[in-house]
């Protein structure tokens, strides 16, 4: 498994990783970025209104992205990247700037959450309880893909709550599919897809942290050693 992860790391652009090292140095030196929308591309809306950099994301907000669009925002000590063609509902006390979780109706979300702050991600087929975790989720009607990139998460099937698993990882070891109605098995093993260490380094850097796998990249000049 370790060799498989190393081969996957090689597939990540060395240039992208190098750029994130530089970004992380600057982020840690400057401190955390301002809360709210940090970066966006394409058609991004919050409650139907076109989003702008600096806009707050509050509990109760609905974030949507169009084709070839994405948005990255910071809330509390958490950072969230929503990919194209997504609908995500921010959860928590009405109007709060610190969220208790996200409901991912459709689309893909990569997020990092501060240690010691339980959060819940929900999709049409899964409820995911997370604790200081980096996690990538793709929500479809028929199934949910979840990669706990590092940390601990409780995966529970919406269709059969007795089908559950606690996943503990340090570097993408146990991706899962959580299936919808009619599937013979509710939780199934899955490959690592559609997200990179570079993105996780960037997200953690925005909130002044480093991901636990950071030591896998010992120097900026030697990014292909795995």
Regions found by a protein language model. Give the residues of each.
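Flexible, surface-exposed loop/linker segments and immediately adjacent secondary-structure boundaries
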Residues: 8, 12-18, 23-59, 66, ...
């Amino acid at each position: 498994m370790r060799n498989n992860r190393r081969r996957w790391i090689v597939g990540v652009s060395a240039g992208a990783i190098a750029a994130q090292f530089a970004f992380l140095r600057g982020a840690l030196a400057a401190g955390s970025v301002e809360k709210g929308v940090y970066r966006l591309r394409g058609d991004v809306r919050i409650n139907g209104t076109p989003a702008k950099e600096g806009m707050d994301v509050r509990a109760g907000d609905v974030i949507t992205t169009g084709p070839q669009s994405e948005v990255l925002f910071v809330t509390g000590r958490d950072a969230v990247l929503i990919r194209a063609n997504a609908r995500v509902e921010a959860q928590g006390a009405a109007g709060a700037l610190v969220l208790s979780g996200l409901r991912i109706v459709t689309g893909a979300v990569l997020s990092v959450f501060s240690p010691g702050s339980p959060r819940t991600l929900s999709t049409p087929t899964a409820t995911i309880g997370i604790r200081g975790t980096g996690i990538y989720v793709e929500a479809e009607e028929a199934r949910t893909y979840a990669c706990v990139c590092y940390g601990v998460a409780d995966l529970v099937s919406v269709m059969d709550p007795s089908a559950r698993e606690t996943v503990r990882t340090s570097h993408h070891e146990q991706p899962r599919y959580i299936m919808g109605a009619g599937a013979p098995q509710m939780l199934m093993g899955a490959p690592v897809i559609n997200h990179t260490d570079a993105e996780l380094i960037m997200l953690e850097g925005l909130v002044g942290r480093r991901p636990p796998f950071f030591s896998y990249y010992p120097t900026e000049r030697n990014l292909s050693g795995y």
